Amino acid sequence: MAVWGPGGRLGLRGCLGARKLLCPRFQSRGPQGVEDGDRPQPSSKTPKVPKIYTKTGDKGFSSTFTGERRSKDDQVFEAVGTTDELSSAIGFAMELIAEKGHPFVEELQKIQCSLQDVGSALATPRSSAREAHLKHATFEAGPILELEQWIDKYSRQLPPLTAFILPSGGKSSSALHFCRAVCRRAERRVVPLVQTGETDANVVKFLNRLSDYLFTLARYTAMKEGNPEKIYKKNDLSDRT
């Protein structure tokens, strides 16, 4: 997961966030029918576009916000990478949800922004953080409280849960259930970092609450779309005889 440092410095590679337009892959290709060979050649005055690849991680190591070099399978990068995966899963779910015209797309986009803040906190291990880094290592409680408000809002409109439900309820609902499962894995990756004091405890609280939100929203989405939820039924082995 990429986290941009002050002044646009790339701290970790992966997602470009707000700076993605600097990457040629995300820029407009210009008028249709114009081939690359027909484009005007850049002059010496054309500003250089920074490359997406740095080659600094080719040996299996990457840098934290604090400048510390760690193996890419370090607990920090496991946690950062899983929260990035979660944000990507939410982005996919948002595309399905937007097609149905659901109004809570903005909530999910806000959550993606909060996950960028989570990544920033995770990528700033407190054991190597200096005073200037501490603002990146803190995750405020505001997003947690907001999730609780959203959960309560949707829960009041849902029928009571009387049985275990399976991930189901249509494409949008199933995508949100998948996001919930990824969120639980992200939480498991973060717990060791909190237990060792490397990361703000609010990060785990946020992910824990987020999984509850995603579960509730999946149920709410199925209800609004009129799709039935599949109920868990224990397999009866006696039926096979």
Swiss-Prot record:
Pfam families: Cob_adeno_trans. Keywords: Acetylation, ATP-binding, Mitochondrion, Nucleotide-binding, Phosphoprotein, Transferase, Transit peptide. The modification Phosphoserine is found at S128. It comes from the Eukaryota. Its EC number is 2.5.1.-. The modification N6-succinyllysine is found at K205, K224. One of its GO terms (molecular function) is corrinoid adenosyltransferase activity. It catalyses: cob(I)alamin-[corrinoid adenosyltransferase] + ATP = apo-[corrinoid adenosyltransferase] + adenosylcob(III)alamin + triphosphate. Residues 27-69 are annotated as: Disordered. This is Corrinoid adenosyltransferase MMAB. The lineage of its organism: Eukaryota, Metazoa, Chordata, Craniata, Vertebrata.
